[in-house]
């Protein structure tokens, strides 16, 4: 299920993005400040380049690049 980023409260969206950008394996040795990484993800969401995907079975959200989202979720 796709969740519109603007359906989330600002603080909730920020926490979701921060969780995503601070996960192991997401920095790839990049020393970019947290605020910059959060801003980049927020911009990707507003441009439609990234989407929030909710899995009802696991009850978890994840951020994905649009081209990585399973096609059936767009139906």
From Swiss-Prot:
InterPro entries tied to this protein: UPF0270, YehU-like_sf
Natural source organism: Pseudomonas fluorescens (strain SBW25)
Signal peptide: none
Superkingdom of origin organism: Bacteria
Coiled-coil boundaries: none
Family: Belongs to the UPF0270 family.
Gene3D superfamilies attached to this UniProt entry: YehU-like (1.10.10.610)
Protein name: UPF0270 protein PFLU_4323
A Pfam family matched in the record: UPF0270
């Amino acid at each position: 299920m796709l969740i519109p980023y603007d359906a989330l409260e600002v603080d909730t969206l920020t926490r979701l993005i921060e969780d995503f950008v601070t996960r192991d394996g997401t920095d790839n040795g990049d020393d970019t400040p947290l605020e910059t990484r959060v801003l980049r993800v927020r911009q990707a969401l507003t441009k439609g380049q990234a989407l929030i995907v909710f899995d009802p079975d696991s009850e978890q959200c994840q951020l994905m690049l649009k081209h990585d989202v399973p096609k059936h979720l767009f139906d």
